[in-house]
């Protein structure tokens, strides 16, 4: 399998399948793909009114509330992001703050799929 074939196969995977792949790679090679969650400045924020008139192509999935199903939301966040239990719990506990970004700079379709998964788990989610 060439590198291009591997990349194409990964592109065709769902978010849940990618999370499973990351977990399997972590176990196989004894590494952790977890990284500290960093909040970056939103691209185009300084663009002003002209940037707002253009249709958005990149979205951030922001957790507004975990409702009364915190454990289910933590599990969903882990599956979506590939974070470890501690990191996912810390991220979920930031719900309602600007730091509660689950995914950044993703397509509208991927953002809506993630929003659907989180809402099914009991979370309140916003796309920005």
From Swiss-Prot:
- What organism does the UniProt record list as the source? Kosmotoga olearia (strain ATCC BAA-1733 / DSM 21960 / TBF 19.5.1)
Q: Which domain of life is it from?
A: Bacteria
One GO BP annotation is: translation
Matches recorded under CDD domains: Ribosomal_L7_L12 (cd00387)
Offer a single GO CC term for the protein: cytosolic large ribosomal subunit
Task performed by this protein:
Forms part of the ribosomal stalk which helps the ribosome interact with GTP-bound translation factors. Is thus essential for accurate translation.
Pfam families per the UniProt record, alphabetical: Ribosomal_L12, Ribosomal_L12_N
Keywords linked to the UniProt accession: Ribonucleoprotein, Ribosomal protein
Describe, as the record does, how this protein assembles with itself and its partners.
Homodimer. Part of the ribosomal stalk of the 50S ribosomal subunit. Forms a multimeric L10(L12)X complex, where L10 forms an elongated spine to which 2 to 4 L12 dimers bind in a sequential fashion. Binds GTP-bound translation factors.
Annotated protein name in UniProt: Large ribosomal subunit protein bL12
Q: Record's PANTHER family? A: 39S RIBOSOMAL PROTEIN L12 (PTHR45987), LARGE RIBOSOMAL SUBUNIT PROTEIN BL12M (PTHR45987:SF4)
């Amino acid at each position: 399998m060439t590198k291009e074939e591997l990349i194409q196969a990964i592109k065709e995977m769902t978010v849940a399948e990618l999370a499973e792949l990351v977990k399997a790679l972590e176990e196989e090679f004894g590494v952790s793909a977890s990284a500290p969650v960093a909040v970056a400045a939103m691209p185009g924020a300084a663009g002003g009114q002209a940037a707002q008139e253009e249709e958005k192509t990149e979205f951030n999935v922001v957790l507004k509330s975990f409702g009364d199903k915190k454990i289910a939301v933590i599990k969903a966040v882990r599956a979506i992001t590939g974070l470890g239990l501690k990191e996912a719990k810390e991220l979920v506990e930031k719900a309602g703050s600007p730091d509660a970004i689950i995914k950044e700079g993703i397509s509208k379709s991927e953002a809506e799929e993630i929003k659907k998964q989180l809402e099914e788990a009991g979370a309140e989610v916003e796309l920005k």
